[in-house]
Structures are given as structure tokens and as C-alpha cells.
Amino acid sequence: VEESIKKEEIQPISIEKNKFTILIAEDNESNYKLFASILKGEYQLIHAWDGQEAVEMFKQYNPQIILMDINMPVMDGYEATKEIRKYSAKVPIIAITAFAYASDEQRVMESGFDGYMPKPINARLLKAQLTEIMQKRIILL
């Protein structure tokens, strides 16, 4: 089940109990659809169009994992992650970015993110990173 929510249309989302919930903060609809096609069926997906909405949806739905685009309107991924970290130091946040230099990855990791995924998205690597995060969370529970 996937839900794409426009800012003016925030509605309750039914969360499936047996699936990890992933919040995808992505302002580009094509990129979101790519994530959805890779992850649908395996995860409960919720969608934020910008960083501010991602913070609001995090507080409302408490997802287990966040995929956070870096370059978004209203509030970028760095600021959104900083805000989310005020509420939870534990939720894994993976930065999704077109910036692919080593210095970009270093900045991401120093900014409170738990992982880094350069665009274009590689489905196999994304699934592997999510599986690793989920296994760590299950061990910690």
C-alpha cells in the first residue's frame, strides 16, 4: 500500500502492522514513483513532498525508516533531518542525493544521517541498505 499526500490533503493513513513503514521525502514525482515501484509490496510507504512535510509526517506516523532527498523546497533534507533528530536519534535516515562526491557523502554522514544513497537509485543497493537497517533494528528491539 502506498500513499502520496499533497500538503493541503494530509489525511489519516492506515498503517499495516506487519510491515516496516518508510517515509519517502521526495519532491520529484518521477523519483517517488521509482522508489514506490522498487519498494511496493514489501513496505508500507508514505510520501512527503518537502522537508517540512516530512517532519510533520514523522511526528504523526512514526515511520521505522526515512528516505530523505537533500534538495527540496520549503525545507531541505539537512534541516528536516536536524528537526527530526530533536524527536528521535534512533530512526534511520538515509540521504538520497544527486551529489555524489566523497565530500558530499562526508557532509551527509556528519549531518545526522545514517546512510547515503546517490542518484540515480540502484534498486539492488537500496534494498540491501534497507535490509541491513531492518536487521539492526530487529536485533535492537
Please provide the spans of the model-predicted regions.
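Active-site beta3 strand of CheY-like receiver
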Residues: Y61-L67
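C-terminal output helix
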Residues: E3, I121-L130
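Disordered, acidic interdomain junction associated with two-component signaling
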Residues: V1-L23, I138-L141
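Charged docking surfaces used in two-component/phosphorelay signaling
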Residues: K33-K40
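Conserved acidic carboxylate
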Residues: E26
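Receiver (REC) domain active-site loop signature in two-component systems and cognate sites
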Residues: M72
